[in-house]
Regions:
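Non-catalytic, charged helical/coil tracts that couple and regulate nucleotide-powered enzyme cores
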Residues: 1-18, 35, 39-40
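Conserved Helicase C-terminal RecA-like lobe
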Residues: 12-33, 54-156
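Short, polar/flexible loop-turn hinges at active-site or ligand-entry regions and domain interfaces
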Residues: 46-55
Length: 156
Protein backbone atom coordinates (compact mmCIF):
# COMPACT_ATOMS: atom_id res chain seq x y z
CA UNK A 1 0.00 0.00 0.00
CA UNK A 2 1.51 3.32 -1.06
CA UNK A 3 1.46 6.21 1.39
CA UNK A 4 -0.83 9.13 0.68
CA UNK A 5 1.76 11.67 1.74
CA UNK A 6 5.47 11.74 1.20
CA UNK A 7 7.53 13.72 3.63
CA UNK A 8 10.24 15.81 2.05
CA UNK A 9 12.40 18.53 3.47
CA UNK A 10 12.16 21.96 1.92
CA UNK A 11 15.78 21.70 0.78
CA UNK A 12 14.93 18.54 -1.19
CA UNK A 13 11.95 19.97 -3.02
CA UNK A 14 11.72 23.68 -3.65
CA UNK A 15 14.14 26.58 -3.46
CA UNK A 16 11.63 29.32 -4.17
CA UNK A 17 9.46 28.81 -1.08
CA UNK A 18 9.84 31.89 1.11
CA UNK A 19 10.88 31.44 4.73
CA UNK A 20 8.15 30.87 7.28
CA UNK A 21 6.77 34.09 8.68
CA UNK A 22 4.91 33.32 11.89
CA UNK A 23 3.01 35.98 13.80
CA UNK A 24 1.36 35.41 17.17
CA UNK A 25 -1.84 37.37 17.66
CA UNK A 26 -3.44 37.51 21.09
CA UNK A 27 -7.21 37.27 20.86
CA UNK A 28 -9.55 38.25 23.65
CA UNK A 29 -12.57 36.25 24.70
CA UNK A 30 -16.03 37.37 23.68
CA UNK A 31 -18.40 38.37 26.48
CA UNK A 32 -20.14 35.02 26.13
CA UNK A 33 -16.85 33.12 26.33
CA UNK A 34 -15.81 35.16 29.35
CA UNK A 35 -19.01 34.18 31.17
CA UNK A 36 -18.46 30.47 30.50
CA UNK A 37 -14.74 30.71 31.33
CA UNK A 38 -15.47 32.25 34.72
CA UNK A 39 -18.09 29.56 35.35
CA UNK A 40 -15.71 26.68 34.58
CA UNK A 41 -12.88 28.27 36.53
CA UNK A 42 -15.09 29.14 39.50
CA UNK A 43 -16.61 25.66 39.67
CA UNK A 44 -13.18 24.02 39.72
CA UNK A 45 -11.79 26.59 42.12
CA UNK A 46 -14.48 25.67 44.65
CA UNK A 47 -13.52 21.99 44.35
CA UNK A 48 -9.85 22.86 44.88
CA UNK A 49 -10.68 25.03 47.89
CA UNK A 50 -12.87 22.33 49.43
CA UNK A 51 -10.60 19.32 48.97
CA UNK A 52 -7.16 20.86 48.41
CA UNK A 53 -4.69 20.02 45.68
CA UNK A 54 -3.39 16.91 47.47
CA UNK A 55 -6.69 15.04 47.15
CA UNK A 56 -7.44 16.19 43.59
CA UNK A 57 -6.37 13.75 40.91
CA UNK A 58 -4.14 14.97 38.12
CA UNK A 59 -6.79 13.82 35.64
CA UNK A 60 -9.32 16.20 37.22
CA UNK A 61 -6.92 19.14 36.85
CA UNK A 62 -6.17 18.10 33.27
CA UNK A 63 -9.90 17.96 32.55
CA UNK A 64 -10.31 21.52 33.87
CA UNK A 65 -7.42 22.61 31.66
CA UNK A 66 -9.00 20.98 28.59
CA UNK A 67 -12.40 22.54 29.34
CA UNK A 68 -10.82 26.00 29.65
CA UNK A 69 -8.90 25.47 26.39
CA UNK A 70 -12.11 24.45 24.64
CA UNK A 71 -13.84 27.53 26.03
CA UNK A 72 -11.04 29.74 24.67
CA UNK A 73 -11.32 28.20 21.19
CA UNK A 74 -15.09 28.05 20.72
CA UNK A 75 -18.01 27.57 23.09
CA UNK A 76 -19.57 24.90 20.85
CA UNK A 77 -16.70 22.60 21.91
CA UNK A 78 -18.17 22.43 25.42
CA UNK A 79 -20.73 19.69 26.05
CA UNK A 80 -24.30 20.88 25.63
CA UNK A 81 -23.42 24.52 24.93
CA UNK A 82 -24.10 24.44 21.18
CA UNK A 83 -27.64 23.16 21.76
CA UNK A 84 -28.19 25.70 24.52
CA UNK A 85 -26.97 28.68 22.50
CA UNK A 86 -28.64 27.76 19.21
CA UNK A 87 -32.01 26.74 20.64
CA UNK A 88 -33.62 30.05 19.63
CA UNK A 89 -31.91 30.34 16.23
CA UNK A 90 -34.63 30.47 13.59
CA UNK A 91 -32.56 31.33 10.50
CA UNK A 92 -29.13 30.56 9.08
CA UNK A 93 -28.21 34.17 9.82
CA UNK A 94 -29.07 33.66 13.50
CA UNK A 95 -26.90 30.54 13.58
CA UNK A 96 -24.06 32.33 11.77
CA UNK A 97 -24.14 35.21 14.28
CA UNK A 98 -24.21 32.80 17.23
CA UNK A 99 -21.32 30.87 15.67
CA UNK A 100 -19.22 34.04 15.51
CA UNK A 101 -20.13 35.51 18.90
CA UNK A 102 -19.21 32.21 20.56
CA UNK A 103 -15.53 32.62 19.68
CA UNK A 104 -13.14 35.56 19.58
CA UNK A 105 -10.80 33.43 17.48
CA UNK A 106 -13.48 32.73 14.88
CA UNK A 107 -14.32 36.44 14.76
CA UNK A 108 -10.67 37.21 14.03
CA UNK A 109 -10.49 34.38 11.49
CA UNK A 110 -13.52 35.92 9.77
CA UNK A 111 -11.59 39.19 9.36
CA UNK A 112 -8.46 37.39 8.13
CA UNK A 113 -10.43 35.37 5.59
CA UNK A 114 -12.05 38.49 4.16
CA UNK A 115 -8.67 40.20 3.89
CA UNK A 116 -6.91 37.20 2.31
CA UNK A 117 -9.76 36.53 -0.13
CA UNK A 118 -9.53 40.12 -1.41
CA UNK A 119 -5.79 39.60 -1.93
CA UNK A 120 -6.42 36.20 -3.58
CA UNK A 121 -4.41 34.30 -0.95
CA UNK A 122 -5.02 30.84 0.41
CA UNK A 123 -4.92 29.82 4.07
CA UNK A 124 -3.95 26.79 6.11
CA UNK A 125 -5.79 26.40 9.40
CA UNK A 126 -4.60 23.97 12.07
CA UNK A 127 -6.31 22.85 15.25
CA UNK A 128 -5.64 20.33 17.98
CA UNK A 129 -9.39 19.71 18.21
CA UNK A 130 -11.06 17.92 15.29
CA UNK A 131 -14.38 19.33 16.48
CA UNK A 132 -12.93 22.85 16.06
CA UNK A 133 -12.23 22.03 12.42
CA UNK A 134 -15.87 20.90 12.13
CA UNK A 135 -16.99 24.29 13.47
CA UNK A 136 -14.71 26.11 11.01
CA UNK A 137 -16.09 23.88 8.25
CA UNK A 138 -19.65 24.92 9.16
CA UNK A 139 -18.56 28.57 9.14
CA UNK A 140 -16.92 28.20 5.70
CA UNK A 141 -19.99 26.44 4.26
CA UNK A 142 -22.24 29.21 5.58
CA UNK A 143 -19.97 31.80 3.92
CA UNK A 144 -19.90 29.83 0.65
CA UNK A 145 -16.12 29.43 0.79
CA UNK A 146 -14.53 26.35 -0.78
CA UNK A 147 -12.13 24.39 1.41
CA UNK A 148 -10.39 21.07 1.89
CA UNK A 149 -10.23 19.43 5.32
CA UNK A 150 -7.60 16.90 6.36
CA UNK A 151 -7.97 15.02 9.63
CA UNK A 152 -6.81 11.67 10.91
CA UNK A 153 -10.26 10.21 10.24
CA UNK A 154 -10.54 7.31 7.84
CA UNK A 155 -13.66 6.75 5.73
CA UNK A 156 -14.61 3.37 4.29
Amino acid sequence: MKPHFLRRLKEEVEDSIPPLNETVVEVGLTNLQNTYYKGIYGENRMVLAKFGTNSIKTSQLNNMDVQLRKCCNHLFLLKGVEEELTRDCKTDEDLYNKLLESSGKLMLLDKFIEKFRKENHKMLIFSQFKRMLDIIELYLRMKGISYEKLTGSVKN
